[in-house]
């Protein structure tokens, strides 16, 4: 098949399930002069994404190298068609290689160029939606952030760029499914179903119950959290209901499962959040500290934004999973720290993630490489045998009142 024998074997393995599509796309491969590899196209697309001029010039040089390499130009053409012209479903981008043998220290720029090829398509989507220029600018700037020192590729290889896994994540932005609104990024999603929430019709209190058959450690975190599993006295939550009541194990707003079965009369407690409930998914890009007031404005603006531009898609809660939601942070950090104050505004719940006995990769050094107060506290915590976890949170839209700590001020039925 045209060009396939010029492609290195790692690429061939990834593309083997799509060999028929490969064959079709290669029929249209120009003999020379692929448009999205031209200097003008690269420069315009890089500028649109807020990429600095010196990096744009490097991308132009790398694009020229790709154009001159039969294997790389064939792969780039295939991905261009499979991502931006006629989406191929089932591509596991996390398994695709980085072309280090051909592009050396610039290997991470290959997938950047593949993303830049999709800029015209993205521009068309934004135009149809009437997207504000400020939101567009802030959203597409995520590519530049991911290419830089805060990105996983730079931390691994010491050079700018992205790998295929990061490209797969950035598809949420290139498909116009994720938007940066202030400090955070948001997208329409739905609750995965690890907890359910019930509201009292008499007091307005909100209680989360674990889904059925979840195993918890004695401390109330998920079995496996922080790399710890199978401890004695671990326990399994159940969730069941009758015509008159719901019975299950509660999750405290601070993020720990409680080994005490409670009963919620259905005449008073109404289910308001469960698997499939529409949410605003919440992501935390690299950036400045999470100033408390800035965080609140970001969430408030996100509510207004999605109600304006996607009125046909209502949502009932914010939701996220992240290292910043580790429920042990209040025991490590001061109560006035940004992370602890953020946690107090939302309803935390345990989930199966965490860096265990290593520092979360997202923790940054201060200016001049000096350890920050957070890093020092985290190091002391690890030295004492502590483990890091991740956590989840939800915040019902009707409870949003930044600074009020709604779930920590309510009475709980246990």
Describe each PLM feature range.
Residues 290-308:
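Conserved acetyl-CoA-binding loop-helix of GNAT-fold acetyltransferases
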């Amino acid at each position: 098949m045209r060009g396939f024998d010029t492609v290195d074997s790692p690429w061939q393995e990834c593309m083997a399930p799509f060999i028929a599509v490969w064959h079709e796309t290669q029929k249209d491969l120009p003999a020379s002069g692929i448009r999205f590899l031209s200097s003008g196209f690269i420069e315009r697309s890089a500028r649109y994404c807020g990429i600095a001029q010196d990096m744009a010039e490097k991308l132009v040089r790398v694009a020229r190298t790709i154009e001159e390499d039969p294997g790389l130009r064939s792969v780039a053409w295939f991905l261009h068609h499979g991502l931006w012209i006629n989406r191929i479903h089932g591509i596991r981008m996390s398994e695709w290689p980085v072309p280090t043998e051909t592009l050396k220290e610039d290997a991470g720029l290959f997938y950047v160029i593949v993303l830049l090829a999709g800029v015209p398509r993205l521009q068309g989507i934004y135009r149809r939606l009437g997207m504000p220029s400020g939101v567009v600018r802030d959203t597409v700037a995520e590519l530049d952030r991911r290419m830089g020192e805060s990105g996983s590729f730079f931390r691994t290889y010491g050079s700018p760029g992205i790998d295929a896994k990061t490209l797969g994540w950035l598809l949420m932005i290139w498909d116009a499914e994720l938007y940066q609104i202030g400090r955070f990024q948001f997208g329409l999603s739905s609750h995965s179903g690890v907890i359910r929430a019930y509201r009292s019709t008499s007091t307005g209190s909100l209680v989360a119950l674990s889904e059925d058959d979840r195993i918890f450690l004695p401390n109330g975190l998920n079995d496996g959290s922080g790399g710890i599993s199978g401890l004695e006295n671990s326990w399994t939550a159940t969730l069941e209901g009758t015509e008159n009541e719901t019975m299950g194990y509660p999750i405290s707003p601070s993020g720990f499962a409680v080994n005490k079965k409670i009963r919620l009369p259905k005449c008073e407690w109404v289910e308001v959040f469960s698997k499939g409930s529409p949410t605003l998914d919440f992501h935390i890009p690299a950036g400045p500290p999470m100033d408390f007031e800035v965080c609140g404005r970001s969430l408030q603006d996100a509510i207004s934004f999605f109600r304006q531009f996607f009125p046909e898609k209502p949502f009932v809660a914010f939701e996220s999973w992240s290292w910043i939601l580790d429920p042990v942070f209040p025991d490590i950090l001061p109560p006035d720290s940004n992370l602890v104050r953020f946690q107090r505004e939302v309803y935390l719940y345990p989930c199966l993630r965490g860096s265990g006995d290593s520092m979360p990769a997202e923790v940054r050094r201060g200016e001049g490489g000096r350890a920050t107060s957070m890093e020092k506290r985290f190091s002391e915590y690890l030295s004492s045998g502590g483990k890091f976890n991740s956590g989840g949170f939800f915040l019902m839209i009707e409870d949003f009142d930044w600074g009020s700590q709604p779930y920590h001020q309510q009475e709980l039925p246990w």
